[in-house]
């Protein structure tokens, strides 16, 4: 039952404003309640639900409730149903399920008090689900007083809050804020350039002397001897021995402190307390990601301060001799300093947890709260930790654990502060009404509680979990060294030219897991030391640090302990390892791993065997066995019993929580369908609807939650409409699983036994890695000189730390180190990561805006200094000049502001993630696959774990091929051949290169008469493809020249850099030492002009290009070739100008559409329909159509794009294709084409389940699609 109350006009306005501003600020909670009959009057009525105590507002008989940010799917379906009545019965079904999903959500943000009549006294009042302020006692002094004056977090005035939410996101973060964030991230990255602390003049002199000395030497041993003489001479002459050895012997903390003094510093106190206080200030500004960075740094510095204090105390004890009163006081001081300050540590963990809750990262928030609780015995923030962990458990649907934490917090909070008491009682009330089944871990916990309620089972369970994390042994780590490979994969040695290959010994169907392999050695890229786990390479928001060096960071105690046993225990505190290059670090870890494996394999054997092993290794170094084939272990593993783990996507925003899984236990319910009133924050146009639920709008870990988009001018005024009331009944148990959770089995492993047959296990061995071809003869003199120099420095380091690292004495040799350095240039895998580029995009756009504003201001100043007549003449002259300059108008000087376009980077509708190399690894077994520009395998990374699957069916005897980077789907033939030769030292002769395939096949302009079938018919156009003639010798020469030019440029840039003035490498760096990097230039994800890397063909010699048709043999050269090339360049320029004007400047005029259509017309006349260049224009036209509210045209161009991609790929096994299908389904859903939408969503979900990458976009999209599919399923169930 519901009870009605009357509101005054002023009160109703307050309520409406507050409801508008609850979008995105509250947290979603799952409920089920019944509505009584609605009064369809013209007044404003407040309704209090008797079951949940929720305050519901009615305007003209329609519900106005606080819909959490992201429930735009519900609004989409409502708008569809209102405007498309032609769908008949399915209309009511979708509408009914929409009301169910929306009515079960409650917002925890407090609304203004209303005058209640006969309100139930037992109903709890709504309070804030999360305390939006950091711990009160830890705030800066200037902020403590306002917080003490209020008993609970206050909400800004309604009008002020509305204005705040309506402004675009970029107005919340101005250019200064983004500059600060970039500076902060760069300073906290702990990124010291390789060997940057060497004296610059010494390093330059060494490199120049090396290059000159070995330029005419061909023998490798002679080069090494010459470099050794120069190296030793320069060390003695320049007295640089002290500088080199000081770096080798330095500690990690010492190098970080030294480097920090000469890099960017901030105006606050550089202590743990200073960083924590600055984090509190940013938290008050709701910059949660920035605050979290500072809290992390505060925790790291706190550990360093403890270590420094302990070292200082020990020195004092030694000086005082430990006797008398002085020694006793020193001991007391040591005890005081070494004891962690619980209040500081607990407040840091509590604040980090609160940031994670506001970022809606509930799983990480629960872990962080547990860390704080483990440190705290009894503290003023203990109740907050329990309270916030309860919130995290509640949103993770672990209601039993949430209830326990809320009860603990309730008990503690009664003794201290009652600010959160109402919210805790509200949560407990909700959990009581939601009788949901317990999850597996909760059932175990409940059984323990029932056995002995008086025992400390929680503490025992936590201790057992910690013991399991700590109990990491060498044997458990060695188990990961075994690679799991399908038994149908066979390794052979084909020839000296081809080398080793992997071949299918039997038929292998598509989507079969072929390889599962952990890296033999790996390391993070230095630019991402502060963002990823050192062990598993997964992104972390709240890291924990090594207590000894305070540098290595991990996502959990398990990773910390595992890495400590595996490698960090030997490397901890050695400063040289954080400044050497990643190639040098991999070589050091490779030799250390070899020594560890050797000692494990030779336990209990005689002492003479190491000498025999040394002799064998020396022989293998002189004559490496390039034909070595690894043999499988005797036993096989049934993959049906050991299926690969497929990670479930987790929600990162509240937008995808339909909340029907939290329905109450009654089997039937009754609901009344109504149409909600369109408010200022509800998207009412096609562009806003798609922008608010854009599938590429992922909430990043490093940016605060996006605010609802402001309405366009056409939808600024609110409107309301009502429909006929429909009553229905349904079985709630059938809708209970509508929301996805971690327990839902969405990714069922295929049951086809052919996909999971027997698998062989291969032990990762150093012998296989040592057999890789080092390509000594292919490395240039410059690169060889640099590697020899690095080898001597590494040798010097290993001589000093041989025992600590456990490296065999025979491996401390320049020749061994140099061999591995040369090998790793071609056999290193680059592990991809996805970086949020929102800040850089907004910053560049803001800079463009500032430049435009400055130009306008200058023009206004000039005009104000002139007479009115002259001013009018000047304006007319300017208009005429603008009309005569097509490059400025209408493309650049658009009247539309940049935020008017829904695909502007300011509107969160562009692809926010770009791919970059976050780490490097060596996978021995996967390295045996050869390259093809049209590969038949697909790589998937889970952190640093590698899985390789068959992309499509592989026949018996067919070679299993990977892709080293350049792909025929993306890159032209010339670019592929040059890049592969420069990076991997071979001329590609794969099928795609032999057939001269590329992303842009050119039509044959010729025609012929079909005299055999129809002698009198008109000429028929030739269906062949124009293939360009390529001289391989000239191409190799061009590749060598290009490589030399690049090395000269790099050398010049290094000379121009000042000492210690080094910034992190750009995201689009040209370092391509990776194995599979085949998504960098993706045509389907080029919605960002700053990230766009279009590889247009370079036509330096227009007249001497030679083409020949593959079918009719017609030839094009001379003027014809020049004309063809000119038309291609014109179409490229038209497309680039139109695309940048649309995305960068927000120009949505008809002129832009005309320009894109003209470019499309030119490209259609030149290229075949499957051309990538044609697909790029289809993608741009679909974006343009959405921004112009033309959904039908957007769907048309998107379908053409999908057809273009499928015809070019030859299959549909692509995550990019799945994203395009998801966009198409979203557009059809907005247009009311329910059947087409459901079909597109089904295809997108099917593709992404099998072929999703580790891009966060894929998980976000897949989560949205699965929710929508379940919504359609629920609608069909209701219809039955």
From Swiss-Prot:
Residues in SET domain copies: 822-965
Binding site for Zn(2+) 1: 533, 536, 555, 559
Residues in TPR repeats: 272-305, 383-416, 1218-1251
Region (Disordered): 1-35, 111-167, 601-642, 659-726, 854-905, 1039-1079
UniProt keyword annotations, A-Z: Coiled coil, Metal-binding, Methyltransferase, Repeat, S-adenosyl-L-methionine, TPR repeat, Transferase, Zinc, Zinc-finger
Record's compositionally biased regions (Low complexity): 16-25, 117-153, 659-697, 712-726, 854-898, 1042-1053, 1061-1079
Molecular function per GO: histone deacetylase binding; methyltransferase activity; zinc ion binding
MYND-type zinc finger segments: 533-572
Coiled-coil regions listed in the entry: 439-468
Residues annotated as binding Zn(2+) 2: 546, 549, 568, 572
InterPro entries xref list: SET-MYND_domain_protein, SET_dom, SET_dom_sf, TPR-like_helical_dom_sf, TPR_rpt, Znf_MYND
GO biological process, one term: methylation
EC number assigned by the record: 2.1.1.-
Family indicated by similarity: Belongs to the class V-like SAM-binding methyltransferase superfamily.
PANTHER family: SET AND MYND DOMAIN-CONTAINING PROTEIN 4
Protein name: SET and MYND domain-containing protein DDB_G0284059
């Amino acid at each position: 039952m519901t009870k009605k109350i009357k509101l005054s006009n002023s009160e109703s306005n307050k309520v409406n404003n507050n409801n508008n501003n609850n979008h995105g600020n509250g947290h979603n909670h799952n409920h089920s309640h019944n509505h009584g009959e609605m009064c369809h009057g013209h007044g404003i009525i407040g309704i209090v639900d008797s079951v949940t105590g929720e305050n519901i507002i009615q305007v003209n008989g329609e519900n106005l409730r606080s819909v959490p940010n992201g429930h735009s799917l519900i609004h989409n379906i409502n708008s569809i149903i209102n405007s498309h009545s032609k769908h008949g019965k399915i209309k009511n079904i979708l509408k009914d399920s929409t009301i169910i999903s929306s009515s079960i959500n409650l917002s925890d943000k407090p609304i203004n008090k209303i005058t209640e009549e006969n309100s139930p006294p037992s109903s709890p009042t709504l309070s804030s689900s999360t305390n939006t302020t950091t711990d009160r006692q830890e705030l800066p002094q200037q902020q403590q007083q306002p917080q003490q004056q209020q008993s609970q977090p206050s909400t800004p005035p309604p009008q002020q809050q509305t204005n705040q939410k309506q402004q675009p996101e970029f107005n919340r973060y101005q250019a200064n804020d983004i500059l600060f964030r970039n500076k902060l991230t760069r300073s906290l990255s702990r990124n010291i350039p390789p060997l940057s602390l060497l004296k610059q003049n010494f390093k330059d002199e060494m490199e120049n002397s090396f290059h000159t000395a070995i330029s005419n030497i061909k023998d490798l041993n002679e080069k090494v001897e010459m470099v050794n003489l120069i190296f030793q001479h320069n060390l003695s002459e320049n007295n640089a021995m002290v500088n080199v050895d000081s770096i080798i012997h330095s500690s990690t903390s010492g190098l970080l402190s030294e480097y920090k003094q000469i890099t960017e510093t901030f105006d606050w106190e550089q202590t743990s307390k200073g960083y924590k206080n600055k984090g509190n200030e940013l938290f008050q500004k709701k910059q949660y990601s920035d605050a979290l960075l500072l809290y992390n740094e505060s925790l790291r510095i706190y550990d360093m301060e403890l270590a420094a204090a302990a070292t200082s105390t020990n020195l004092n004890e030694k000086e005082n001799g430990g006797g008398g009163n002085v020694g006793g006081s020193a001991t007391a001081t040591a005890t005081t300093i070494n004891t962690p300050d619980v209040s500081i540590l607990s407040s840091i963990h509590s604040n980090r947890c609160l940031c994670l809750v506001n970022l809606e990262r509930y799983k990480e928030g629960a872990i962080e709260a547990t860390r704080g609780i483990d440190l705290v015995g009894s503290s003023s923030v203990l109740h907050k930790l329990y309270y916030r962990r309860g919130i995290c458990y509640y949103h993770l649907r672990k209601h039993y654990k949430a209830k326990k934490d809320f009860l603990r917090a309730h008990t503690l909070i009664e003794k201290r502060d009652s600010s959160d008491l109402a919210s805790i009682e509200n949560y407990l009330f909700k959990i009581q009404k939601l009788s949901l089944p317990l999850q597996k871990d909760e059932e175990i916990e409940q059984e323990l509680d029932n056995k002995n309620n008086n025992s400390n089972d929680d503490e025992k369970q936590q201790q057992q979990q910690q013991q399991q994390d700590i109990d990491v042994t060498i044997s458990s780590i060695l188990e990961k060294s075994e690679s799991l490979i399908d038994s149908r994969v066979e390794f052979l040695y084909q020839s000296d030219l081809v080398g080793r290959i992997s071949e299918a010994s039997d038929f292998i169907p598509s989507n079969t897991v072929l390889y599962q392999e952990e890296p033999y050695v790996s390391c993070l890229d230095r630019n991402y030391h502060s963002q990823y786990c050192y062990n598993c390479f997964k992104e972390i928001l709240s890291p924990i640090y090594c207590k000894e060096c305070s540098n290595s960071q991990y996502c959990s105690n398990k990773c910390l302990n595992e890495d400590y046993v595996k490698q960090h225990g030997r490397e901890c505190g050695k400063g040289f390892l954080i400044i050497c290059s990643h190639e040098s670090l991999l070589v050091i870890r490779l030799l250390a791993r070899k020594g560890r494996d050797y000692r494990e394999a030779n336990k209990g054997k005689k002492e003479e065997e190491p000498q025999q092993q040394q002799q064998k290794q020396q022989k293998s170094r002189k004559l490496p066995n390039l034909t070595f084939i690894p043999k499988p272990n005797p036993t096989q593993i049934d993959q049906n019993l050991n299926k690969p783990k497929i990670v479930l996507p987790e929600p990162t925003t509240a937008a995808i929580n339909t909340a029907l899984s939290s329905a109450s236990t009654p089997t039937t319910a009754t609901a009344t369908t109504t149409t909600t009133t369109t408010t200022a924050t509800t998207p009412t146009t096609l562009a806003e609807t798609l922008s608010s639920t854009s599938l590429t709008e992922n909430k990043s870990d490093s940016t605060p939650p996006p605010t609802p988009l402001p309405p366009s001018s056409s939808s600024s005024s609110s409107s309301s409409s009502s429909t006929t009331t429909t009553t229905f009944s349904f079985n709630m148990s059938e809708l209970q699983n509508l929301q996805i959770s971690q327990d839902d089995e969405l990714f069922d492993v295929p049951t086809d036994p052919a996909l999971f047959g027997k698998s062989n296990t291969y032990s990762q061995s150093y012998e296989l890695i040592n057999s890789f071809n080092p390509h000594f003869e292919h490395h240039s003199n410059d690169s060889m000189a640099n590697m020899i120099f690095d080898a001597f420095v590494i040798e010097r380091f290993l001589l000093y730390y041989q025992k600590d690292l456990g490296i065999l004495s025979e491996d401390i040799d320049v020749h061994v180190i140099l061999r591995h350095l040369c090998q790793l240039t071609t056999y290193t895998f680059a592990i991809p990561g996805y970086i949020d580029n929102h800040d850089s995009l907004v910053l560049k756009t803001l800079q463009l805006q500032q430049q435009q504003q400055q130009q306008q201001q200058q023009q206004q100043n000039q005009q104000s200094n002139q007479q009115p007549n002259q001013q009018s003449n000047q304006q007319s002259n300017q208009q005429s000049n603008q009309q005569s300059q097509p490059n400025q108008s209408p493309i650049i000087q658009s009247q539309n502001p940049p935020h008017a376009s829904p695909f502007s980077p300011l509107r969160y509708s562009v692809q926010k993630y770009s791919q970059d190399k976050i780490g490097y690894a060596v996978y021995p077994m996967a390295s045996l696959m050869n390259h093809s520009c049209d590969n038949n395998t697909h790589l998937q990374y889970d952190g640093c774990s590698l899985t390789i699957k068959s992309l499509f069916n592989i026949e018996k005897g067919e070679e299993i091929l990977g892709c080293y980077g350049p792909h025929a789907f993306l890159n032209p033939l010339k670019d592929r051949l040059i890049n592969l030769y420069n990076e991997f030292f071979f001329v590609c002769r794969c099928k795609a290169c032999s057939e001269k395939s590329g992303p842009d096949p050119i039509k044959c302009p010729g025609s012929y008469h079909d005299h055999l079938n129809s002698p009198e018919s008109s000429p028929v156009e030739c269906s062949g493809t124009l293939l360009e003639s390529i001289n391989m010798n000239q191409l190799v020469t061009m590749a060598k020249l290009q490589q030399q030019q690049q090395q000269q440029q790099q050398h010049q840039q290094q000379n121009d850099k000042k000492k210690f003035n080094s910034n992190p490498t750009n995201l689009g760096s040209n370092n391509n030492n990776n194995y599979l990097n085949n998504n960098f230039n993706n045509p389907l994800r080029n919605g960002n002009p700053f990230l766009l890397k279009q590889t247009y063909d370079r036509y330096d010699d227009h007249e001497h290009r030679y083409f020949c048709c593959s079918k009719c043999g017609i030839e094009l050269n001379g003027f014809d070739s020049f004309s063809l090339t000119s038309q291609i360049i014109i179409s490229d320029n038209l497309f680039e100008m139109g695309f940048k004007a649309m995305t960068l400047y927000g120009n949505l005029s008809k002129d832009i559409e005309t320009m894109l259509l003209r470019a499309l017309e030119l490209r259609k006349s030149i290229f075949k329909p499957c051309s990538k260049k044609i697909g790029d224009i289809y993608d741009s036209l679909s974006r343009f159509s959405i921004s112009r509210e033309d959904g039908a045209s957007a769907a048309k161009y998107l379908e053409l794009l999908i057809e273009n991609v499928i015809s070019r790929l030859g299959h549909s096994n692509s995550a990019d294709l799945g994203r395009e299908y998801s966009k198409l389904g979203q557009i059809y859903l907005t247009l009311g084409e329910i059947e087409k939408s459901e079909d597109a969503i089904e295809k997108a979900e099917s593709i992404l389940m099998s072929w999703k990458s580790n891009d966060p976009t894929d998980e976000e999209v897949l989560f949205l699609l699965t929710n929508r599919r379940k919504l359609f399923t629920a609608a069909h169930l209701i219809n039955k």
